[in-house]
């Protein structure tokens, strides 16, 4: 039911346009595990399915064919001999769907977790190729929808297939995690009454993954929920990290090594530095891993301002992973009430400061909207300059820079606090000095604006007047543009 879907307006529009088109459609919906792909399709179209089945993790070909046979009998109302191959299976599916061509305006087939059907030596891809190219692609009322969480498979075998399925997908839809606005709507739909500070901290821990958010119990506070989900004995999310990577990526060990390395470097690392640290001799697998991790929103690729030629930086930005690696992985003994006991501790303050920076990077469009520059061409950078005493070069770092076509550069400070942030005279001088260091290092002629992105605003004082623009927490909760 459409009213049960939170957010996803653009994705719903794309799917509905495909369903209502007058041509055959091969729709591939992909994204990381637990993000709500299956839920979206079932809520939107479940009552209209002419056939549905799902792959199951680590099931054999024979088990999957047996399940296919059961589903076909369920939808067709006729029991047939169990197929021995995927060629036979798709032939039976074609025969059944052919009986619907005249009576149904839309014939919707939904195959969920498609990658898990492609077991070794199963010839699944070839059979799917023959089904689509040999018949379904000529039927204007066929709407073939597939979903998959296994990113390596989806990008290599389907979306990037060089064989018969190359360019056959008519619509690719990537389902991203919720933003803050969608997270708030989701929690409200569950009867959870929290402040926006609490919702933001929840987002900083779990990210915008609906499956995780759905585990929250409305009768408990945020710290109590985090203790139960992450730190209590048998906590549901304490082992999620391992399975998440195994289910998404074929070579999950390499992907975890990359992520765990990047977790140690807040500003990120270059490709060459990652290769050297992991003792990799070939860059092919690393390039594929980077692309997959970016496409699943685990990491981001960015350029340092003025240093494009020195190679891109790769930075871990997935909030759940950052939290897990910081507080859970490798900890043999954990306090079952760790998060409740950590409120306002030095460790909590240090973590929340960095996590808030990552939250801001997930909401660049909301920041641009507040600054009134949605229609202005803007490049997003970070910047750092290492100190060199011999050359008289001072060190400096800016985590978010918005380089605008209208001759302004926003140098952004991201600050998380429960009270209005107090810009002291000493801190203002530090900001002004850093702005001048950046001006000299970048040799820019653009106007440099000091911009604060804060969780609780800026305290009104003499120094506050030197700040050109401010983005607040409520602005970050704005609807995605």
Indicate where each model-derived feature is located.
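Phosphate-binding site recognition
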Residues: 1-341, 346, 450
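A cross-kingdom feature that marks ATP-driven nucleic-acid transaction machinery
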Residues: 305, 312-481
């Amino acid at each position: 039911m459409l009213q049960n879907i939170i957010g996803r307006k653009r994705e719903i529009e794309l799917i509905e346009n495909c369903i209502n088109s007058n041509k055959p459609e091969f729709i591939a919906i992909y994204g990381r595990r637990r993000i709500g792909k299956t839920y979206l399709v079932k809520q939107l179209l479940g009552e209209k399915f002419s056939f549905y089945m799902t792959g199951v993790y680590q099931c054999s070909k024979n088990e999957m064919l047996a399940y296919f046979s059961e589903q076909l009998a369920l939808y067709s109302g006729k029991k047939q001999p169990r197929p021995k191959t995927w060629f036979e299976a798709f032939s039976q599916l074609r025969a059944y769907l052919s009986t619907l061509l005249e009576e149904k305006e839309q014939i919707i087939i939904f195959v969920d977790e498609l990658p898990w059907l492609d077991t070794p030596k199963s010839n699944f891809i070839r059979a799917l190729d023959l089904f689509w190219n040999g018949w379904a692609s000529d039927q204007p009322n066929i709407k073939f929808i597939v979903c998959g969480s296994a990113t390596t498979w989806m990008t290599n075998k389907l979306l990037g297939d060089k064989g018969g399925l190359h360019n056959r997908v008519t619509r690719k839809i990537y389902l991203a995690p919720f933003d803050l606005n969608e997270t708030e709507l989701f929690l409200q739909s569950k009867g959870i009454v929290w402040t926006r500070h609490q919702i933001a901290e929840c987002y900083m821990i779990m990210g915008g993954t609906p499956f995780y958010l759905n585990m929250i119990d409305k009768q408990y506070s945020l710290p109590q929920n985090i203790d139960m989900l992450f730190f209590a004995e048998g906590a549901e999310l304490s082992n999620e990290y391992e399975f998440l990577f195994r289910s998404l990526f074929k070579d999950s060990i390499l992907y975890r090594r990359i992520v765990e390395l990047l977790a140690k470097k807040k500003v990120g690392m270059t490709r060459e530095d990652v290769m050297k640290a992991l003792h990799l001799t070939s860059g092919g697998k690393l390039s594929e891993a980077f692309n997959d991790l970016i496409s699943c929103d685990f990491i981001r690729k960015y350029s340092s301002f003025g240093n494009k030629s020195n190679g891109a930086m790769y930075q871990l930005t997935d909030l759940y992973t950052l939290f897990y690696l910081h507080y859970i992985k490798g900890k043999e003994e954990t306090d079952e009430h760790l998060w409740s006991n950590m409120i306002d501790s030095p460790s909590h303050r240090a973590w929340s400061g960095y996590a808030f920076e990552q939250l801001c990077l997930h909401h660049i469009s909301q920041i641009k909207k507040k600054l009134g520059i949605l229609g202005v061409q803007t490049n997003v950078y970070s910047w750092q300059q290492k100190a060199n005493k011999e050359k008289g070069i001072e060190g400096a770092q800016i985590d978010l820079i918005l380089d605008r076509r209208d001759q302004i550069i926003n140098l952004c400070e991201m600050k998380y606090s429960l009270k209005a942030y107090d810009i002291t005279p000493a801190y203002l001088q530090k900001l002004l000095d850093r702005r001048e260091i950046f001006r000299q290092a970048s040799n820019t002629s653009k106007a440099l604006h000091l911009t604060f992105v804060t969780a609780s605003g800026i305290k009104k004082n003499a120094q506050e007047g030197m700040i050109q623009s401010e983005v607040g927490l409520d602005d970050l909760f704005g609807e995605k543009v």
